[in-house]
Amino acid sequence: MSIRCLAVLLFHDDEDLVADQIEYYKYKNNHDIIVFNHNSTDNTKYNIEKYSDDILCIYELSSKINFANHEVFDTIFKILDQNPNIKKNEIKISNTNGYNLNFKENYDWISFPESDEFLEGPDRKKTFYEYLCDIHNKKEITSIKYLTFTYWFTEKDDMEVESPVERIKYYCVNKPGDTSLYKTKSINGNSSAKFFTWRANKIEKTFFGHPKNNNNRNLLIWNTRHYEIREKKHLINKLKDRADNNNGCHHYKIMNEKLKTNSFYDLKSNELYFDDGINDLNMNEKFNWTKIYPYS
């Protein structure tokens, strides 16, 4: 079976992830791609444009479309819905037809991961795309929840390797500290279930993968690899940027304050599991993520 899949990618100062994201979703998982670049100050824009032939449309969002009140996400979901009520004068598009691509009609499945998230199926027997093909005829399935596996920089990382996905190999599952995935809350994790994938005609507005209503547990749970913090310099810059930026993720302010007095963000490889890229990810909660994240 062949199905039509779209990946929606949103970048903000993610110059190191652009190539990995496009390679993973387009070439390893048979997705078409649209890209939103929000007010990046590094080389993200340049790196995106290098792959312009691989992207259906690039949407450059100005700083006047901000994260406050979820405006960035509102804009993206309105474009997916072909809702004209957006600030078009604050958006530059690479494709003149960028507002008329009929996403809901032209695609079977749409995924909108975070820029540092790499979506997988429930295990590694098949690719993400192959698992989407498997469930396509199960009409009762309209969306997919994801369990987070957090990857972190360690002393084992070879900084000569540019690709974060190739360089960072140590991780631990971060199970929800709520009941969004399982009946029992985790005491070592404090993530929440994330919705990143929907049938194209059933897409639901989210904020960084979090829907307004996350009460209904869905038995279909897949995995996502989350490379949020990729080196010490990146940690410092990201926490400072997000702490000063009203993007709705208030835990960055708390983390930034802790960074000034603590060094516990420097994890050792033996605190985590090694990912060989072949075997299934380990579900055991070896590391207590509540030491890192005050809440999610």
Model-derived regions: residue spans:
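N-proximal low-complexity "stem/linker" segments adjacent to membrane-targeting elements
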Residues: 1-23
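Short, acidic, metal-binding catalytic loop of nucleotide-sugar glycosyltransferases
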Residues: 23-31
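Ser/Thr-glycine-rich phosphate-binding loops at phosphate-binding pockets of nucleotides
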Residues: 24, 36-44
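Short acidic/polar active-site loop segments enriched in Thr and Asp
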Residues: 31, 108, 142
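Short beta-strand/loop segment that forms part of the nucleotide-sugar
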Residues: 31-39, 59-63
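Active-site acidic Asp-centered loop
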Residues: 38, 113-115, 122
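Active-site-proximal specificity loops/subdomain of glycosyltransferases
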Residues: 45-112, 120-121
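Catalytic-site signature of metal-activated, phosphate-bearing donor transferases
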Residues: 69-74, 84, 90-97, 121-296
